[in-house]
């Protein structure tokens, strides 16, 4: 375990492997033998660019003895996840917190959360009931609609304080009716982004799980025009269908997507190519470090995929949905660094339930535009040595072409 440098920079530890719905209280209970500096204010979660908890947090402690006690908790469990504990320092903590998450410094504490997966016809009253006991500001609920006036299955909620917003994150994966609701950290800036000019509809091609190259069915995807680089026959973006069974919106073609492009930000920075058959379409990832999965069980969920890669913590997961509304048995999993993506390849051919999963690396050492440099990752206890060295030279076209160019492609249908 790599320790941070000694010095007079406070008493800080970093936790990694936290459950996605982890709350401040969960961290306090995990470190119950330690005294946390300033109580709840001493726990700092690290968020991804989409406002989701990254599975990591910094905790400020009162003394060096508290740090030693915290380090003894390394590899102990919180729920079904085992937690790694690293020694850190204030400089590292401040740098990471400044460079992670969707929020700028002036909007980081404005009390917003984003909901995803709302039932069709969900009302503001139901959202208020969902957050019963947490004060929402007047007119603090925003329900975005698409250009046709249909609800998107998402909502923004502003609470009376950032502390209440943090508590609201504890409602992640609880139900409204029969739907599981996902709760993410958000900001006023993100709410404003939903009032951008309407996104354009663009027709692209995507091969079905059993189609041969060149015979892909046509379907409609929604993309941000600024993110398009090239388009030819046979192209598609893997970012179009990442909402699995919880999304509250269907586009009429059988797959679900965010009409305001939030998860399509997956396609808008950190370029890498996806190639299918004779065509190609340049799409982009937020980090540029992706692993493509093939052979997923029909009922596999995002949480199953996160658990599959544990103790690694993917930045996000996109389960692919075909134009017939069924999962394709494939997914794209994005990691914060090239090193983590390479480490994830050690799970190639491992089982998920009764299916073995094929993995394809889609990452290069120079592609990262994320917050963590190699040097910083070393300081945070992450090895920068490749653990799956033979895969780094795989070309994107090679690993993706294999998914559709052969006769042994594994779909997700059992």
Curated annotation (Swiss-Prot):
Sumoylated. It comes from the Eukaryota. Residues 81-86, 179-184, 355-360 are annotated as: Interaction with RNA. Residues 11-90, 111-188, 289-366 form the RRM domain. The modification Phosphothreonine is found at residue 215. One of its GO terms (cellular component) is spliceosomal complex. It is found in: Nucleus, Nucleoplasm. There is a cross-link at residue 72 (Glycyl lysine isopeptide (Lys-Gly) (interchain with G-Cter in SUMO)). The modification Phosphoserine is found at residues 104, 161, 187, 193, 195, 265. Keywords: Acetylation, Isopeptide bond, mRNA processing, mRNA splicing, Nucleus, Phosphoprotein, Repeat, Ribonucleoprotein, RNA-binding, Spliceosome, Ubl conjugation. The modification N6-acetyllysine is found at residues 200, 224. One of its GO terms (molecular function) is single-stranded RNA binding. The modification N-acetylmethionine is found at residues 1-2. It holds the Pfam family RRM_1. Transmembrane segments: none annotated. One of its GO terms (biological process) is regulation of RNA splicing. There is a cross-link at residues 87, 167, 185, 200, 224 (Glycyl lysine isopeptide (Lys-Gly) (interchain with G-Cter in SUMO2)). Its main location: nucleus. The keyword Signal does not apply. PROSITE patterns: RRM. The record marks 16, 20, 52, 75, 116, 120, 150, 173, 294, 298, 326, 349 as: Interaction with RNA. SUPFAM superfamilies: RNA-binding domain, RBD. Identified in the spliceosome C complex. Interacts with AGO1, AGO2, TBP and TXNL4/DIM1. The N-terminal RRM domains are responsible for recognizing the G-tract of BCL-X RNA. Component of the heterogeneous nuclear ribonucleoprotein (hnRNP) complexes which provide the substrate for the processing events that pre-mRNAs undergo before becoming functional, translatable mRNAs in the cytoplasm. Plays a role in the regulation of alternative splicing events. Binds G-rich sequences in pre-mRNAs and keeps target RNA in an unfolded state. This is Heterogeneous nuclear ribonucleoprotein F. It comes from Bos taurus. The gene is HNRNPF.
């Amino acid at each position: 375990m790599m320790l941070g440098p000694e010095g007079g920079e406070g008493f800080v530890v970093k936790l990694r492997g936290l459950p996605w719905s982890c709350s401040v209280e969960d961290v306090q209970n995990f470190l119950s033998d330690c005294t946390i500096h300033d109580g709840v204010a001493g726990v700092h979660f690290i968020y991804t660019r989409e406002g989701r908890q990254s599975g990591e947090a910094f905790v400020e402690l009162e003394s060096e003895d508290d740090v030693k006690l915290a380090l003894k908790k390394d590899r102990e469990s919180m729920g079904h996840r085992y937690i790694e504990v690293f020694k850190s320092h204030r400089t590292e903590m401040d740098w990471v917190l400044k460079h992670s998450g969707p929020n700028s410094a002036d909007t980081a504490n404005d009390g917003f959360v984003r909901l995803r997966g709302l039932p069709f016809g969900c009302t503001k009253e139901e959202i208020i009931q969902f957050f019963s006991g947490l004060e929402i500001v007047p007119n603090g609920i925003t329900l975005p609609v698409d250009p046709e006036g249909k609800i998107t299955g998402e909502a923004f909620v502003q609470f009376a304080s950032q502390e209440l917003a943090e508590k609201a994150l504890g409602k992640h994966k609880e139900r409204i009716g029969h739907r599981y609701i996902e709760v993410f950290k958000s900001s006023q800036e993100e709410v404003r982004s939903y009032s951008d000019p309407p996104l354009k509809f663009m027709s692209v091609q995507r091969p079905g799980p059993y189609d041969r190259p060149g015979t892909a069915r046509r379907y409609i995807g929604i993309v941000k025009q600024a993110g398009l680089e090239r388009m030819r026959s046979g192209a598609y973006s893997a970012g179009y269908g990442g909402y699995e069974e919880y999304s509250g919106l269907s586009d009429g073609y059988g797959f679900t997507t965010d009409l305001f492009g939030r998860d399509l930000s997956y396609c808008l920075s950190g370029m890498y190519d996806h190639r299918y058959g004779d065509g190609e379409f340049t799409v982009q990832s937020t980090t540029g470090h992706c692993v493509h999965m093939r052979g997923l069980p029909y009922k596999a969920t995002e949480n199953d995929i996160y658990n599959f890669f544990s103790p690694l913590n993917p930045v996000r997961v996109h389960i692919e949905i075909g134009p017939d509304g069924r999962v394709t048995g494939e997914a794209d999993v994005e990691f914060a660094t090239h090193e983590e993506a390479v480490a994830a390849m050690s799970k190639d051919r491992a089982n998920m339930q009764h299916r073995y999963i094929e993995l394809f690396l889609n990452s290069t050492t120079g592609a990262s535009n994320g917050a963590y440099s190699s040097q910083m990752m070393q300081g945070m206890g992450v090895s920068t040595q490749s653990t799956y060295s033979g895969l780094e030279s795989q070309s994107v076209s090679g690993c993706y072409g294999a998914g559709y160019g052969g006769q042994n492609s594994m779909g997700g249908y059992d």
